[in-house]
Amino acid sequence: MSRRLLLINGPNLNLLGTREPHIYGSTTLQDVETQAKTQAKELSASIDTFQANSEGAIVDRIHAARGEIDAIIINAGAYTHTSVAIRDALTGVDIPFVEIHITNVHTREAFRHHSFLCDKAEAVICGLGVFGYTAAIEYAAKHIKLRGKASRL
């Protein structure tokens, strides 16, 4: 059975392509999502995409993934550095996830160096630009060991 993936993008990622293109590049979120769907299909997987600027909406989407999704790819944006709620949601649903960042957060401002998610993630990808999404999707589709209900399929 094909893997069911969920790509979550957090606050301000809806502005990709126009927000600080010298940092984040000119690729739009729609471009990222279109490429993700094409890639997932090529890997015999399916992918749902979701973007929200509010923490609660992200938590709700993670909860809704329980029993339906095999792996999550998440770019939590600024919530990476602040959100215990997103961390708790990810650990609570027991779905393996890959944390992703377009930029190398470790070479940026000090407040971006800490992640509330990384110690629970299967993998962390940062600094590869939007290619990081490609790497994360391939990893999630091919290499993550499934857990819970998904692992019994």
From Swiss-Prot:
Superkingdom as given in the UniProt entry: Eukaryota
Catalysed reaction equations from the record: 3-dehydroquinate = 3-dehydroshikimate + H2O
GO biological process: 3,4-dihydroxybenzoate biosynthetic process; quinate catabolic process
UniProt site positions, description: Transition state stabilizer: 19
GO molecular function: 3-dehydroquinate dehydratase activity
Statement: the UniProt record of this protein carries the keyword Ubl conjugation: no
Pathway given in the UniProt record: Aromatic compound metabolism; 3,4-dihydroxybenzoate biosynthesis; 3,4-dihydroxybenzoate from 3-dehydroquinate: step 1/2
InterPro entries listed in its UniProt record: DHquinase_II, DHquinase_II_CS, DHquinase_II_sf
EC number(s) from the headed UniProt entry: 4.2.1.10
UniProt: substrate binding residues: 75, 81, 88, 102-103, 112
SUPFAM superfamilies registered for this protein in UniProt: Type II 3-dehydroquinate dehydratase (SSF52304)
Keywords: Lyase, Quinate metabolism
Active site: 24, 101
Assembly and interaction partners: Homododecamer. Adopts a ring-like structure, composed of an arrangement of two hexameric rings stacked on top of one another.
Protein family membership: Belongs to the type-II 3-dehydroquinase family.
Functional note: Is involved in the catabolism of quinate. Allows the utilization of quinate as carbon source via the beta-ketoadipate pathway.
Protein name as it appears in the record: Catabolic 3-dehydroquinase 2
Species per Swiss-Prot/TrEMBL record: Fusarium vanettenii (strain ATCC MYA-4622 / CBS 123669 / FGSC 9596 / NRRL 45880 / 77-13-4) (Fusarium solani subsp. pisi)
